[in-house]
């Protein structure tokens, strides 16, 4: 299934020095977002920075949203994750996509201009309406949480 999403290029290096976001394989769920920096930047352990991507999107369809998710290799190998853990992009947002990057590792990390730093995933949205009740119909799980269903 393919859905058209409006994309605005805000940095002329996209499409010349750096490719447009694209799916790497037919089974890919996310498209890589790149750090559109003018120079390398070093994040000390514990540092958080906001990194421009040079792109803006307008999803338009209220049945869709975008999420910005971490790249697994950066997190596992270098401790580089998203400062807000997940970025949620509403369908009516039209500003630049920015990535909050946090170095939760023990070593400094130098990010290079054009480096792939996160991935963009388009997802369906269900808007719920609440029905006020005095009691819930009993479920098997009930109020159990935080490991109550076991480990195996």
UniProtKB/Swiss-Prot annotation:
Reaction(s) catalysed (UniProt annotation): dUTP + H2O = dUMP + diphosphate + H(+)
Which residues are noted in the entry as substrate-binding?
A: 71-73, 84, 88-90, 98
The similarity comment for this entry is: Belongs to the dUTPase family.
Keyword Metal-binding present in the record's keywords: the answer is yes
Q: Mind listing the UniProt keywords for this protein, alphabetically?
A: Hydrolase, Magnesium, Metal-binding, Nucleotide metabolism
Q: Which organism is it from?
A: Aeromonas salmonicida (strain A449)
| Claim: Hydrolase is one of the keywords in the record | yes
The record's GO molecular-function terms, alphabetically, read: dUTP diphosphatase activity; magnesium ion binding
User: What role does this protein play?
Assistant: This enzyme is involved in nucleotide metabolism: it produces dUMP, the immediate precursor of thymidine nucleotides and it decreases the intracellular concentration of dUTP so that uracil cannot be incorporated into DNA.
Entry's Pfam families? Answer: dUTPase (PF00692)
Q: Name one GO biological process term.
A: dUTP catabolic process
Q: What is this protein called?
A: Deoxyuridine 5'-triphosphate nucleotidohydrolase
Q: Under which pathway is this protein filed?
A: Pyrimidine metabolism; dUMP biosynthesis; dUMP from dCTP (dUTP route): step 2/2
In the Enzyme Commission scheme, what number(s) does this protein have? 3.6.1.23
Which cofactors does it use?
Mg(2+)
């Amino acid at each position: 299934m393919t859905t058209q999403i409006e994309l605005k290029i805000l940095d002329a290096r996209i499409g010349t020095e750096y490719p447009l976001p694209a799916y790497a394989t037919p089974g890919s769920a996310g498209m890589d977002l790149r750090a559109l920096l003018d120079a390398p930047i070093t994040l000390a352990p514990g540092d958080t920075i906001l990194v421009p991507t040079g792109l803006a999107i307008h999803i338009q369809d209220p049945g869709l949203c975008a999420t910005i998710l971490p790249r697994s290799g950066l997190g596992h190998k270098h401790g580089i994750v998203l400062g807000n853990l997940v970025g949620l992009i509403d369908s009516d947002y039209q500003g630049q996509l920015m990535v909050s990057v946090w170095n939760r590792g023990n070593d400094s990390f130098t990010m290079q201009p054009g480096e792939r730093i996160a991935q963009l995933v388009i997802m369906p949205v269900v808007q719920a309406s609440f029905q006020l009740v005095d009691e819930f119909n009993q479920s098997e799980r009930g109020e159990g949480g935080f490991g109550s269903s076991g480990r195996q």
